[in-house]
C-alpha cells in the first residue's frame, strides 16, 4: 500500500507541475502540431473525399469486381455479348465493368449508343491499342484501329473518295458479275455426284463463299485474282488475326503483364501471321508496281510516290489499308451470306417467298442485268436485314476509347475508359422489337431501318465517324451473292434433316461465324441453265 501511495504522490506532483516534465511538454507540442496540420489538411481531405464520393455516385452501376481479375468471371458463363446482355438486364443499359485492369463501360440501349456514336462521337472517336492491332494491323496504321486524329481523317478520306466511293463500287460491277457466276458454277460442280443413300452430294458453302469474296476483293484491290497459294496463305494468316482481335487477349486486359503473351507464344503466333501477310502483300505490291493500272493498290502507290500528304505514307501504310479491305471484303461478306442461307433453311415459308420474288424478277433476264435489278428485290433485302439483326457479323462493335471525361446516360465516363457497344443485345431486345427472337423479315417493311445507323437499335456496321467505310462495297456484293444463290438453285437439307435440325451455334472472334459450316443440297433451277 505504501508503494502505491508513493507512486500516486509522484504522479500528482508531476501533474501539478507540468513545467518540470519535459516529456509532457513534448506531448503538448506534438498535439499542437497535429492539430495545426489537421486543420490545414482537413479542407483538402474533405474535397478529395467529396470528389471521390461524387465520382462513385456518378459512375455507372455494375456487378462486383474481384481484385486483379476485375469482373472477367462474369464473362465465362457464355459468349461475351450474351453474358453482357444478362448483366445489363440487372444493372442497366450503361454498365461499368472492370475487365482485368481495364475500366470498361458497356452500352446496351439505343439512347446511350446514340450519345456515344452521334451526340458525343468526337469524344469516343478513338480506339484502344490492342496486341493484334499493334502486330497484325501494322501498328495501328489501318483505318479500323488508327487513333482518332489527322492521320485517321486522311485514311478515311482516302477510303471514301478514292477507294470505296459509290463510283468505284459501281465500276466493279463486271468483277462481281463474273465471280458470282463462277461461284454458281463451282457450287454445281461441287454438288455433282451422289451422297450417301443415293441422294445428291451436300455442298459446304463456307469455303466456296470465302473463295468468291476473296477473289472479288483481290480483283478490286489490284486488278487480278490471287493465285491459289497466295490465297491460302492469306486466309490462314487472317484466321489467326481474327481469332485474337476481339480485345480479350491477356495483354489487352492486363497491360502491365503483357510479357505473358510472349511466354504463351501468342506474340510469336501473331508475328508469324504478320510475316505471312507481308509475303502476300509484297508480291501484290510488286505486281502492281510492274503493271500500272487503275486498281486500288495502284491508286495507293501513286499517292505514296507523289508524297503530297502531310504524314509519312509508305509501303507499310499501304499494307495496313489492303488488310482492312481484304478482311471486310472476304470475312464479313462470306459469313453474312452463310447466315442468310442458315435462316432460310430454318424458315421454309420465307425461303419459298423470297425465292419466288427473285425468280420473278430475274427470269428471262441476262445475267449481266441481275445486279441492276437488285433494287426490285424488296423482300430479299428484308431477309438480309433480318438475318443481320439476329446474326450481326459484329455483335460487339469495335471498342471505342473515351478521349475526354463526359457523361453517358447521366453517368460519368472517365477519360481513358474503354466503351463497348453491345449491338447484338439491342437487336434482340423485346423492348425495341416485337417477337425479338423470331425470324420475321416483314418487320423491315416500313423501310425505317437501314445499314447506316438510322435506328440505333440496329447497327450491323456501326455508325458515326468510325462506321465501317466499306459497308456499301460489302452490301452490294452480299445482295448479289444471295440473289444468285436463290435464283440458280433449289436448296434442301441433307437426307434425314428437318428445318429445326439446323443448328445456329456460333463462335466469336472479331466477327461471328457459324460454329459448324452449313451443308446443303443444291439442285439447279431448270429455267436458269448454268454453263460450266
UniProtKB/Swiss-Prot annotation:
InterPro entries linked to this entry? Cyt_P450 (IPR001128), Cyt_P450_CS (IPR017972), Cyt_P450_E_grp-I (IPR002401), Cyt_P450_sf (IPR036396)
- Where in or outside the cell is it found? Membrane
Its placement in the membrane is given as: Multi-pass membrane protein
Enzymatic class: oxidoreductase
Q: Per the annotation, which location comes first and is thus the protein's main one?
A: membrane
The entry's keywords = Heme, Iron, Membrane, Metal-binding, Monooxygenase, Oxidoreductase, Plant defense, Transmembrane, Transmembrane helix
S-S pairs: none
Against Gene3D superfamilies, the record matches this protein to: Cytochrome P450
Q: Name one GO cellular component term.
A: membrane
Note on file? 3-beta-hydroxy-9-beta-pimara-7,15-dien-19,6-beta-olide is a precursor of the phytoalexins momilactones A and B. Phytoalexins are diterpenoid secondary metabolites involved in the defense mechanism of the plant and produced in response to attack (by a pathogen, elicitor or UV irradiation). Momilactone B can also act as an allochemical (an antimicrobial and allelopathic agent), being constitutively produced in the root of the plant and secreted to the rhizosphere where it suppresses the growth of neighboring plants and soil microorganisms.
Protein name, UniProt field? Cytochrome P450 99A2
According to its UniProt entry, this protein's organism is Oryza sativa subsp. japonica
Instruction: Recall the taxonomic lineage recorded for the source organism.
Output: Eukaryota, Viridiplantae, Streptophyta, Embryophyta, Tracheophyta
Gene symbol here is: CYP99A2
